[in-house]
Amino acid sequence: MPVGTRRHTSTHFTPVEVAVEAAQFLCGGAWENPKILDVGSGMGKFCLVGGAMFEQAHFTGVEQRKSLCDVADQLLEYSELNNVGFLCGNIMNVKFSDFQGVYLYNPFYEHLQPFSAMDETIELDADYYEIYCGYVRKQLQRMPKNTRVVTYFGGGEEIPLNYDLVKQGFHNDLKCWQRR
């Protein structure tokens, strides 16, 4: 784990029990072999848990921080899962149309609360929060019927009006959405 990251585990990284429930919802939809996108995947816990649970699905994590991408790649190599992959880059370079499900653990929050930043490797700005949420919302709006999205924490700014909230859990912090 990168230096300084451990103190952020409860704030920035998905608890295993949340990953299990989120993966179950995302893989339980209309697609036989769903492709799931994890936005802001960090060290890849959600993707690795989901990939271990659902061999027929494929999980892709996208993360901006190279140090976290490196850890995710190491964990993936150790896990020997062949249905998980990680991209190191910006979410605005990802085509959501390649996926049938999306997992969002409040990936842009630190742009609003710089004091909660994990490190100083990416530029933080409240404008980026709006830009990234807007990009995700537009991408989700264009997705086909039955696309599934799970949000953990966050205010749901990324969720377009053409999605229904179909399930909640973990004190209503976990929300499961489906495209109409």
Please state what every model-predicted region is:
Residues K45-Q56:
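Conserved SAM-binding loop of SAM-dependent methyltransferases across substrates and taxa
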Residues F99-F115:
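A short SAM/SAH-binding and catalytic strip from SAM-dependent methyltransferases
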Residues M1-W31, V71-D98:
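S-adenosyl-L-methionine
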Residues E32-G42:
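Conserved class I S-adenosyl-L-methionine
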Residues H111-R179:
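C-terminal substrate-binding/active-site "lid" region of AdoMet-derived donor-dependent transferases
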Residues S67-L68:
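Conserved short alpha-helix immediately C-terminal to the canonical SAM/SAH-binding motif I
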Residues H58-E63:
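Conserved SAM-binding motif I beta-strand of class I
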